Amino acid sequence: MKYIEVDEELYRFIASKTERIGESASDILRRLLTLPVDTVTPFEPNAIDEPSLDVAHHQASNFAASNQEQQTGHGHAGEPSAVQTPESNDYAKAQPHSSGYQPGQLEGHKSEPQTLAQLNSQPLAVGQSSQSATSQVDFNALVNEHLLSQQKGAVGRFMWLLEGLAALAPSQFNKVLLVQGKGRLYFARSKDELLASSASANPKEIGTTGYWVTTNNNTAKKQAILVEVLTKLHCDETLASAIADRICDKVAG
């Protein structure tokens, strides 16, 4: 059996010549062309296996059987239904309570609401403080006139004051890294980092802290840098300016 395509007009013409029910297009054309009409077995395409349809049919059958058992009450005890649906009572009973996150509740622990008095009576954890996170630093103790006078020049006094400040506030001294110029570093954790910022930085390490500072600037700039460092550590601005003035030769002398 062969297949051909015909236009709409020709199709309607052939169909209009049908004389009996079940007459095929081949029979009609043979009759119109006065050709012998043979009994031709109509072509039937081979069935195509579709496993997905079989599975769907199987699930639908199980679903129907499950519903019928629930309605008639003839289901076997201890045997779960093939398919459970939200409408079934068994399914609803099988659903656990919501296990999503609940505020104040951790796995295996149910917290109880606490009053403000209870919270205030609890001890603080290690590292916490009821006061400001910034520890109280006695900045007046930074200047020792005798030792300061023994330092060599403005650079020596500048370095000595920074080293003393690191000893007074070791946990906060990393804030010096926040003191920067326009496109230039004043403090760093390595000599190379300062030299990369400025080849003429003349970096020096602040004691043995691991922090480095540039020293190739004039005295006024050193004073401005020290004032900013002190205020970063929450020193009073007036006191910070007074301490920074000790870098100057006239004041120190």
Swiss-Prot record:
GO terms for molecular function: DNA binding. Residues 66-112 are annotated as: Disordered. Keywords: Cytoplasm, DNA replication inhibitor, DNA-binding. Gene3D superfamilies: Met repressor-like, Replication modulator SeqA, C-terminal DNA-binding domain. GO terms for biological process: negative regulation of DNA-templated DNA replication initiation; regulation of DNA-templated transcription. Belongs to the SeqA family. Negative regulator of replication initiation, which contributes to regulation of DNA replication and ensures that replication initiation occurs exactly once per chromosome per cell cycle. Binds to pairs of hemimethylated GATC sequences in the oriC region, thus preventing assembly of replication proteins and re-initiation at newly replicated origins. Repression is relieved when the region becomes fully methylated. NCBIfam families: PRK11187.1. This is Negative modulator of initiation of replication. The lineage of its organism: Bacteria, Pseudomonadati, Pseudomonadota, Gammaproteobacteria, Alteromonadales. The gene is seqA.
